[in-house]
C-alpha cells in the first residue's frame, strides 16, 4: 500500500509561478497528515578569503541578512497561498547548485516526497527544466512534478513487471485522495520485446503473433484493473510506450500521471531517452514518479 510518511518538501522561488507547486504540496501534506517544508536555494556567495579574515565576517553578515529577508518573503507567500503559519511550515535555506540544494534538503529532513515544478517554454507549455530533471532522477523518494492540470482521471502506467506494480498502488492512493477514477495503461511495443534487430532481419512480426500477444496483455490488464479496483478501467495501446501514455493522458484530460522508475521495459531508470523521462518531460498534467527498489 502506497503511503507517504515523511514530510513533504517543495522547492519554491519568490515569484507567483511557484503558487501552483505550493498548493499541490500543501494538499499532499494535508492529505497524509505530514509536515510541509519549503526549500529555497541561494547561489553560493560565501567566498573563501584566507588572507582577509575580516571579509569573511562581512560576507557572513550579508548572507545572514539575505537569508532572513528570503525567509520573510517566503513566509509571506506561504501564508497567502496556504494560510499556514509556523510551526505548521518549515523553511529550509540552502546554498549552491539548485538541484543539489533540493536533494540535500530532502535527505536532511527525511522527506516522504518532493514536489517541484518545471518551467514554461516560449509556447506557454510546461516542460521539465534541468533542475527538476536532476531531482526526479536522483531523489530517494517519490517526486511530484506539479503542473496546472485538468480535473480528469489518474492514469497509472505499467509494464506488468513486479517492480512496476507499486506505481499502480500509488495511482490508486492518489485517485482516492483526489476523488478521481483510476485508469491503468499498458502499451504493446512488440519489437523491443523480441529484439532491437528483429525487424531488420525478419521484417514486421506476423499479425497473428501480434493478435496473440494483444489477447495475452489484455487478459493481464483486465486482471490488474480488477485487482486494483480501477474504476476508470484499463487502456491497451499499440506502439512505443511514451507516446501512447502521453496521448492517453491528453485524451482523458488526466489530472495526474503515475510512473515507476524500475520496470523492465523502459521504466528501468530515469535516464535520457527512457519512457519515464519522456513522460515526465512532456506530460500535459502533473506527474508522480515512484522510485522502486
Regions found by a protein language model. Give the residues of each.
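Small/aliphatic-rich secondary-structure junction motif
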Residues: 1-59, 151-207, 230-235, 282, ...
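A short acidic, glycine-rich active-site loop
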Residues: 57-72, 203-216
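Gly/Ser-rich helix-loop-strand patches that form or flank binding pockets
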Residues: 4-6, 22, 27, 31, ...
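Conserved beta-strand scaffold positions in the cores of enzyme catalytic domains, especially
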Residues: 91-93, 143, 234-236, 287
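Charged docking surfaces used in two-component/phosphorelay signaling
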Residues: 93-101, 236-244
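A short, acidic, amphipathic alpha-helical segment used as a generic capping/interface helix at domain edges
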Residues: 220-223, 240-250
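A structural motif corresponding to the C-terminal end of an alpha-helix
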Residues: 74-90, 220-233
